[in-house]
């Protein structure tokens, strides 16, 4: 198991990642424009990866869109993009038709909850069952030209075992259950901070922890 460079955000910086993702989604959906990060906080110049999830707040809270900053999990460790720009790109992709089959519409925006996961450590593993710590490690799976990922907080929120966590990530990548055991499938673990909108005007963003 090997680790990459650590990037840790303050709560204020984390809250701003969510604001930037929200602004990027709205600019894309309403005007077809790419949000410019502008004068970024110092932490946003770090070269690291980010993921964005868009969930509907209606009904059972179905996933409306999700995307990472890179087109392939193989590129997770290639820190060639600043965090601010990575968030903008991921937010736009999450809101696009390519993410969950249909582009987010303007009327949906008030009922969309935005969350951001910033990658703080990259963990390369040959034995995910042994190495995964639930609530700490996100999972990214890449194989057969497909890729998928899940936040580190999801297995704790949903009471998944390590095996279920890996299988569900395989399904996210359109791979069969158990594909994570195949030699030609790459499993990468990542540690990250997850920040999410709350819908509360007084405390609009929370940091999720296990």
UniProtKB/Swiss-Prot annotation:
Which residues are in the AMMECR1 domain? 12-206
Q: InterPro entries this protein is in?
A: AMMECR1, AMMECR1_dom_sf, AMMECR1_domain, AMMECR1_N
Matching entries from Pfam families are given as: AMMECR1
Which PROSITE patterns does the UniProt entry name for this protein?
AMMECR1
Q: What is the superkingdom listed in this entry's lineage?
A: Archaea
- The protein depicted here goes by the name Protein VNG_2543C
Look up and give the organism this protein is from. Halobacterium salinarum (strain ATCC 700922 / JCM 11081 / NRC-1) (Halobacterium halobium)
């Amino acid at each position: 198991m090997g680790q990459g460079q650590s990037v840790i955000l303050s709560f204020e910086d984390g809250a701003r990642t969510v604001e930037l993702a929200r602004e990027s989604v709205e600019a894309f959906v309403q005007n077809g424009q790419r949000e410019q990060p502008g004068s970024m906080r110092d932490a946003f110049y770090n070269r690291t990866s980010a993921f964005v999830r868009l969930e509907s707040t209606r009904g059972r809270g179905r996933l409306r869109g999700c995307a990472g900053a890179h087109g392939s999990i193989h590129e997770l460790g290639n820190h060639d993009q600043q965090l601010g720009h990575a968030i903008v790109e991921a937010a736009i992709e999450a809101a696009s038709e390519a993410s969950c089959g249909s582009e987010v519409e303007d009327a949906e925006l008030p009922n969309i909850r935005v969350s951001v996961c910033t990658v703080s450590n990259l963990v390369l593993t040959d034995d995910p069952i042994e190495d995964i710590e639930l609530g700490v490690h996100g999972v990214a799976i890449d194989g057969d030209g497909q890729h998928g990922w899940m936040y580190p907080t999801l297995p704790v929120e949903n009471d998944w075992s390590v095996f279920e966590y890996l299988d569900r990530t395989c399904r996210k990548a359109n791979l069969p259950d158990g594909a994570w055991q195949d030699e030609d499938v790459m499993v990468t673990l990542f540690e990250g901070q997850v920040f999410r909108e709350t819908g509360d005007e007084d405390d609009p963003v929370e940091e999720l922890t296990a």
